Amino acid sequence: KDLDKITNKDKYNNLLEDVTKGNTSKFIATFRELFEELVDDMGYKAVVVYIDDLDRCEPKRIIGCLEAVKLFVNVRKTAFIIGADERIIEYAISQHYPIQMKKEDISSPFSDYLEKLIQLPYKLPRLSDNEQETYITLLLCKNHLNDIYFNEIHQKYLEFRKTDKHSKYNIDDIKANIPKDKKIDFHAVEYRLPTVPLIKRFLNGNPRQLKRFLNTLYVRQELAEVAGFTDIRPEVLTKLMVLEYNTLYNSRFEELYKLQNANRGVLPLDDVEQEAKTENGIQNPQWKDNWSSDYLRQWLSSDPSLKDINLQNYFWIARDALKNEKPIASLVTNKVMLLFRRLCTLQTNS
């Protein structure tokens, strides 16, 4: 009974009757009043509603949620926090309200819609280069060291962060803060550190994307180990993967596959990597047309060089990203095919 009294259950039941009768305007006004009373009666300083990952919903649901928020945005002691990709939200609005943008318009009507709803916008900044290096190094430590060692490293980092929020906390800092009597093997971490400059340079500094990228890198290295590919260098694999991850240029990843496939695994680079560093740019006719953008020139000229490296095994472990029409068997090296046949023979004999 006390709960019914606090929540005004009878009044809410009467409101539902108004809705069934089609009197929605009265329902909305009365519901807001009752909601304000409920917030006051609870005694809280404020009620904060956090709506996360709204951009994962379909456009219709996004609009429905935004319209619901509009009803309560001016209710006393309430605040709504929306976590979402602004581009996806604007797209949903454009699908629901197909308004033609005029040439003289400075901003789109869809961003205007958001400005009227969102009173205090805050865009999460991308990680700085120092923050990226710190984050990636700590992720590598977490994946390759036991929990006890990692927790100690992380605690030291948190202490460092209290006094310095701008400098990077790299492997040298980590080692310097480890007691001398503790012998921690950082070989697995240091083996993968050459990937850090590439990841910092060519990914966009989004923590979620960085973690996802590293997870994919780990999976492919595991595939290489299972397949017996002992020549896979993490920095070479990373260089290929950052190109694959770029949605504007992932077709160039396919092009590299075709080029190396036609040349027994080795790209016909000649002096292309050096030309990419010059003001005149790429002159090689085979590469000039499709590889002359600033991004691709930076990618070609970045370390490590891919010249004279056999990339067959690299593309084999990345075959899930290839959209060619050739069967997977054509990507498998003779060594792996022989191993597969032996396994089949053993299975048949058993």
Short names for language-model regions:
Residues 1-11, 17, 21, 33, ...:
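The feature marks long, low-complexity, polar/acidic/proline-rich intrinsically disordered regions embedded
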Residues 16-17, 121:
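Short hinge/gating elements
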Residues 22-27, 33-87, 91, 96-98:
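Conserved Walker B catalytic segment
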Residues 44-50, 115-119, 192-197:
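Glycine-rich, often proline-containing surface loops adjacent to acidic residues and nearby aromatics
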Residues 52, 122, 206:
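Residue-level signature of catalytic and energy-coupling elements of molecular machines
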Residues 84, 92-111, 226-233:
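Flexible phosphate/Mg2+-sensing switch loops adjacent to catalytic phosphate-binding sites
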Residues 101-138, 142:
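Conserved P-loop NTPase catalytic core
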